[in-house]
A protein has these predicted regions:
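Acidic Gly/Asp/Thr-rich repetitive segments characteristic of extracellular carbohydrate-active
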Residues: 27-57
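Ser/Thr/Gly-rich low-complexity blocks that favor extended beta-strand/coil architectures
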Residues: 134-135, 141, 145, 159-215, ...
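Glycine- and acidic/polar-rich repeat regions and solenoidal domains
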Residues: 69-91, 115-118, 247-252, 274-276, ...
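Small/polar beta-strand repeat architecture
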Residues: 20, 194-247, 380-383, 389-410
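All-beta strand scaffolds that present successive hydrophobic residues in beta-strands
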Residues: 58, 98-101, 125-129, 238-239, ...
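Extracellular beta-strand-rich solenoid/capping regions of secreted or surface-exposed proteins
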Residues: 46-47, 64-98, 109-128, 135-152, ...
Length: 410
């Protein structure tokens, strides 16, 4: 009898506990031809759910997002370009948030200088069943229809001539609210949709200024082309702008978050990494695709890596994904080094990054363990637990650890 009472109590307790588990609220957003910008609506929904616990479910249709009313934040994103960003979906310190669509029938289209998704210090975040694109690519593309070794010039037919401009005689390409001079460039073979073999022989030296002129309504001549070989007729010239300014708008930016999943999502364009995760734990990409839109005529999807993971832990899962036509790696998984530049005391030192696109990275925090190595041979010099970190600026941190550096020679 007593045992039966205990069993009843356990069953009753389980029922009571399960009944207390809350379920995230679901908010459906249907396409409305009268809504030009869905950014304010999404910002309002997220503001009304500061802790998360919400599912935002988009129906079929193309949903547009503009930067004017997007939430802003200064972002230091590793291997991308730091700066103040407008973010269409800005999730901070939230848990159990889902952004869903109706599969291929749902397109989220972003306009101009805007980061689609920023997730910071969150848990259990899911993106599922939609397509991401921009109104205008962050890449200039033009078919080479002529070249002249005598004048060091090439003639292009721009894929989007309305986005090409000539400013002070030099070539620029534009978007909704941005404009870029020409810079880093690479040549594609339209037959194979891959870069030309030994493509560097066709790359224009960015230190040399190109001059541009219209030839009729649809052709552009670029003069002063400086390369070992001129791009052959029939190739596709692509340009993503100057180094240090062409990785400003990653598609997905995840920071210090856990349990983030991207499922059945297609990304057609991004002005930086398609997906970057920093100091995250357990990130899963399943049926995540980075590719150009069908029948678009484009050679390039994302302007950098399809996926990139920095300082992450737990599991990184890439399952049944497809990455093509981006201008960098399919995936890149690594940590970060800092250089000791000042010895302030035995266990206190100043440190800087070795690459400008890692500046501002959250390198370490109290309780982490650091390994000190000799940069000449990567030999381990010692280990120490972090006691304090002071971010003086993006490229100078003062760090105190339990390891005494005074015995280590310069």
């Amino acid at each position: 009898m007593f045992g039966m009472s205990i069993r009843k109590f356990i069953i009753l307790s389980a029922l009571i506990v399960s009944g207390c588990i809350s379920h995230p609220e679901t908010i459906d957003i249907d396409f409305d031809s009268g809504t030009e910008d869905y950014t304010p609506l999404v910002r309002k929904i997220l503001a009304e759910h500061p802790a998360g616990e919400v599912t935002i479910r988009f129906g079929a249709g193309t949903f547009d997002f503009y930067p004017e009313q997007a939430a802003g934040s200064y972002l230091c994103v590793s291997n991308n370009d730091n700066g103040y960003k407008r973010c269409a979906f800005l999730l901070e310190e939230m848990r159990r948030v889902r952004i869903e669509g109706a599969g291929e029938k749902t397109q989220l289209r972003f306009h101009g200088a805007i980061v689609p998704f920023r997730v910071a210090r969150c848990e259990q975040i899911v993106f599922e069943a939609f397509t991401i694109d921009y109104d205008a690519s962050f890449i200039f593309e033009g078919l080479v229809v002529g070249n002249d070794p005598r004048t060091h010039s090439i003639t292009l037919r721009p894929l989007d001539p309305e986005r090409f401009e000539i400013r002070s005689g030099e070539p620029w390409f534009t978007g909704y609210d941005w404009a870029s001079p020409f810079g880093e460039n690479i040549l594609f073979d339209p037959g194979t949709r891959s870069p030309y073999y030994q493509a560097e022989q066709y790359e224009h030296d960015q230190k040399k200024t190109l001059q541009a002129e219209w030839i009729g309504d649809s052709l552009v001549r670029l003069s002063g082309y400086s390369s070992r070989e001129l791009p052959p007729v029939g190739s596709v010239y692509t340009d993503k702008g100057p180094h240090s300014t062409n990785r400003r708008y990653p598609g997905f930016s995840f920071y210090k978050s856990a349990g983030v999943e991207v499922r059945n999502v297609t990304l057609h364009d991004s002005g930086g990494m398609a997906l970057i995760a920093e100091n995250c734990r357990n990130v899963v990409c399943s049926q995540y695709r980075v590719e150009v839109p069908p029948q678009s005529g484009r050679m390039v999807s994302a302007s950098a890596d399809a996926t990139h993971f920095v300082g992450c832990s737990g599991k990184i899962v890439l399952r049944a994904c497809r990455f093509e036509s981006m201008l960098d790696d399919a995936t890149n998984i690594h940590g970060v080094y800092m250089t000791v530049v000042d010895r302030l005391s035995g266990n206190r030192f100043g440190a800087s990054f070795g690459h400008f696109q890692q500046e501002g990275f959250d390198f370490a925090e109290q309780g982490d363990s650091l390994v000190f190595i000799d940069r000449a041979d990567l030999g381990v010099l010692g280990c120490g637990r972090v006691e304090e970190v002071n971010h003086v600026n993006e490229n100078y941190y003062i760090i105190r650890t339990g390891f005494d550096l005074s015995a280590i020679p310069d």
